[in-house]
Amino acid sequence: MRWLYSTSHKDIGLLYLVFAFFGGLLGTSLSMLIRYELALPGRGLLDGNGQLYNVIITGHGIIMLLFMVMPALFGGFGNWLLPIMIGAPDMAFPRLNNISFWLNPPALALLLLSTLVEQGPGTGWTAYPPLSVQHSGTSVDLAILSLHLNGLSSILGAVNMLVTVAGLRAPGMKLLHMPLFVWAIALTAVLVILAVPVLAAALVMLLTDRNINTAYFCESGDLILYQHLFWFFGHPEVYILILPAFGIVSQVVSFFSQKPVFGLTGMICAMGAISLLGFIVWAHHMFTVGLDLDTVAYFTSATMIIAVPTGMKIFSWMATIYSGRVWFTTPMWFAVGFICLFTLGGVTGVVLANAGVDMLVHDTYYVVAHFHYVLSMGAVFGIFAGVYFWGNLITGLGYHEGRAMVHFWLLFIGVNLTFFPQHFLGLAGMPRRMFDYADCFAGWNAVSSFGASISFISVIVFATTFQEAVRTVPRTATTLEWVLLATPAHHALSQVPVLRTASSH
C-alpha cells in the first residue's frame, strides 16, 4: 500500500519510470507488428486487415508519446531529481503529485479498452475529422477520454513542478545557478500548461460532434479548425518530449567531460527560444491544406529559425566534449549517439520546413523517418542516458558495462537500419499509414524491418543489464542529487542546504 498512497517524490518518480518501461514494451510490440506487416508487399501478418493496421498505428503513436516518453522524462526523472537538484525536501504539493501519477494507469487502460470495442480507433494518433467523427461505436470516445485523463495528469504535474522550482529552491540557489536539467523541466512545465488545454478543447469539440450533433468540424463546421487546434498542441508536444532529454544530455556530457557545459547562459536562452518558437510554427504540419501564400511563407521562415537555438545547443555540447577530458562510459555513448542522431533529424526537419519540398513528401515515409530520428533516437537515447547515469542512484542497481555497450550498439545500428531507409522510401513516394505497397518499395522495407528486429533484440539485452551493486559517489559529482548517497532518507533532504558557492553544471 506504500506505493499507492506514497507522497514521496522518489517513490512517485520510480513509479513513473516503471510505468514508462511497461508502456515502452507495449508500444515497441505494436511497432514490431507494423514492421512485420510491412516486411513484404501483399497480405502479411494482419491478412490485409487495414482497419486493424490503423488501430495498431494509433495505439503505437499515442502509447509511445504519452505513455512512454513523457512519463519517463517529465514524470520519472523530473519527479525524482528536480526537488533534490534545487535543495527542496519534496515537491510543493506531494498529494497532488500522487494523483498526477495515478491518473495514468486508468488512462492507458481506457486506451487499450478502446482497441477492443467494435473495430477500434483507426484514426491515427492525430484523430483528424471527418474520419474520427464517423467512426461507429464508442472506441474513439474511449480514446478521447484516455487522452483527457493523461492531459489532466500532465497539467497537474506541470503546475507542481513550476511551483516547486519557483518557491522551494534552497537559499543561495539563484535561477542561473540551477542545473540545466531543472531548467529543461521548468520550461517543459510551461509548455504543458499552455499547450495541453488547447488539445483538451479540441477533443471536447470532437466528442460533442460525435455524440450530440454539434458542427464544430463536420457538416457546416471547419475541418481545418481541428488541425489548427491539434497542431497548436502537437508541435509544442514535440518539445515537451525533447527538452527534458536536452537537460539529461547536458548533465551527462558535463559530468563525463569533467567540465561545465560550454556557454551555460546561452544554453538556457536556447531552450527558452526553442520553447517560445515551438508555439508559433504549428502550421508547418498543414502546408497541403490550402493556406495562402503569405501564411506559408511565414511558417516556413519561422520553422527554419528554430534551427538556430537548436544549433547553439548542438555546438555547445560539442565544445564541451572537445575541451574536456572525456570519460567514455555507457551514458556518455548514449549522449553522443543522441547528439549525432538528433542532428540528422534536425537536418531533415530543415528540409521539411521548405513548403515546396514538404508538399511533395507530406504524409510519406520521409516524414516518418524525420520524427523518428528526433523521437526514437532523440528522446529515447536521452532516456537511456539518464537510466544508465542515474540508475544506481534511483534503484541501487548497477549495470554490466559490457552488456550495456552491446545494448547501445545494437540499438544504434538497429534504429538507423530501421529509419534511414525510410528517407528513400518517402522520396520515392511511399505513403505512410498504408498496410500494403507497390513492389518497387519492397527492398528498403525489408531492410527497415530487419533493423527493427535488431532494435527489439537490444531491448532484451537491456532487460538483462542491471545487477546488484553498491551505491557510490562519483568523484566528479557537482550537483546535489549525489549528496543523497550519504543520506538515503524517505524524503530527499531532512535539512534544507544553504549554497555558499554556486555550481552551474
UniProtKB/Swiss-Prot annotation:
InterPro entries: Cyt_c_oxase-like_su1_dom, Cyt_c_oxase-like_su1_sf, Cyt_C_Oxase_1, Cyt_c_Oxase_su1_BS, Cyt_c_oxase_su1_dom. The keyword Magnesium applies. CDD domains: Cyt_c_Oxidase_I (cd01663). It is a multi-pass membrane protein. Pathway: Energy metabolism; oxidative phosphorylation. Cu cation binds at H235, Y239, H284, H285. Disulfide bonds: none annotated. Binds 2 heme A groups non-covalently per subunit. Binds a copper B center. Component of the cytochrome c oxidase (complex IV, CIV), a multisubunit enzyme composed of a catalytic core of 3 subunits and several supernumerary subunits. The complex exists as a monomer or a dimer and forms supercomplexes (SCs) in the inner mitochondrial membrane with ubiquinol-cytochrome c oxidoreductase (cytochrome b-c1 complex, complex III, CIII). This is Cytochrome c oxidase subunit 1. It comes from Chlamydomonas reinhardtii (Chlamydomonas smithii).
